[in-house]
């Protein structure tokens, strides 16, 4: 496992911003990233965020979003060391309340209305329809490592989805197509005294905006197409493109969005399992999540 170089990263960032010392306070830390509040001798504060691949280009996405007019925290300085990104960012302070559905659609309308930017990876129809095949490749590598041996049902489900993917991925580039936040949840929207800011751009890409809208209510509870339909209608009312309600891939917009969002999550979980986390001890939790999502995908995409 790569040693976390956060102390050295912070030293580099302090030098870059003309600071000499800072007191660190953990906000949230996990194996691949961390967020801390740092206090400087003059009483000012900043947010120190560090992350390893594949989360190591968030500074570029945040600066790009800021340039294009999306309300995001300002990046004061960033540095990369041994495959880890470190950022010193504006401290937004405490939130005054939790973000609600109307806050979410307002933020999505602004983000999705932003012109797309070349540095962002692209998830178009060709890329979308390969997600089940990519997940099968991850499964093959896991099994070669003598892991996921009792997951024939996962392979069978992915095979079925792969066969239907060409037809079901149709309409991927219908509007809204552009900036996708990809971690679009109420916790990613900070409502402060000076308005809102969108956080956590580490996995932003260019693709179907419906994936953002379908992620807002999370993946812990079973997917709820009727609730998403209401949310899509709120999005259109708030100024989002009416095409957000248009059928695609032979499905309603809400079924298409929820189904492909879950398939996108499955491929990401499996890539984490073999490539980024790569810890057999986590396999039972990953397999459980993948099975649950694949059941939803088969139902939502009517396969």
Task: Give a label for each model feature.
Residues 28-40, 166-211:
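Active-site acidic catalytic loop and adjacent metal/ATP-binding pocket
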Residues 291-303:
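Membrane-interface aromatic/basic loop that binds lipid-linked glycans or pyrophosphate carriers
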Residues 27, 32-127:
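ATP-binding pocket architecture of kinase catalytic cores
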Residues 81-99, 136-147, 263-284:
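A glycine-centered beta->alpha junction motif in the catalytic cores
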Residues 1-25:
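Juxta-kinase regulatory segment immediately upstream of eukaryotic protein kinase catalytic domains
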Residues 95-157, 175-177, 205-206, 288:
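A cross-family kinase active-site recognition segment
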Residues 210-243, 259-282, 293-296:
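Active-site activation/catalytic loop segments of kinase-like enzymes and analogous catalytic loops
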Residues 15-22, 57-58, 144-145, 161-173:
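Short Pro/Gly-enriched beta-strand edge/turn motifs at strand-loop
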């Amino acid at each position: 496992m790569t040693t976390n170089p956060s102390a050295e990263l912070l030293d580099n960032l302090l030098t870059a911003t003309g600071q000499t010392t800072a007191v660190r306070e953990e906000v949230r830390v996990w194996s691949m990233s961390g967020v801390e509040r740092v206090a400087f001798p003059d009483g000012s504060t900043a947010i120190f965020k560090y992350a390893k691949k594949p989360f190591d280009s968030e500074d570029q996405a945040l600066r790009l979003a800021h340039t294009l007019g999306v309300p995001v925290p300002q990046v004061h300085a960033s540095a990369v060391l041994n495959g880890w990104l470190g950022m010193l960012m504006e401290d937004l302070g405490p939130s005054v309340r939790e973000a609600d559905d109307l806050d979410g659609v307002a933020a999505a309308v602004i983000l999705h209305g932003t012109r797309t930017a070349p540095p962002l990876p692209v998830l178009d129809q060709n890329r979308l329809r390969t997600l089940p095949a990519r997940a099968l490749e991850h499964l093959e590598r896991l099994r070669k490592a003598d892991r996921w041996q009792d997951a024939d049902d996962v392979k069978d489900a992915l095979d079925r989805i792969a066969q239907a993917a060409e037809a079901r991925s149709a309409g991927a580039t219908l509007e809204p197509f552009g900036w996708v936040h990809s971690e679009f949840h109420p916790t990613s929207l900070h409502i402060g005294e000076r308005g809102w800011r969108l956080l956590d751009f580490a996995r932003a890409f260019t693709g179907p905006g419906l994936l953002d809208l379908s992620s807002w209510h999370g993946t812990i509870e079973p997917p709820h197409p009727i609730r998403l339909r209401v949310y899509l209608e709120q999005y259109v009312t708030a100024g989002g493109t009416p095409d957000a309600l248009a059928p695609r891939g032979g499905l309603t917009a809400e079924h298409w969005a929820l189904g492909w969002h879950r398939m996108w999550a499955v491929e990401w979980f499996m890539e984490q399992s073999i490539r980024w986390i790569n810890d057999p001890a986590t396999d039972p939790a990953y397999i459980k999540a993948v099975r649950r999502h694949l059941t939803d995908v088969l139902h939502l995409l009517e396969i």
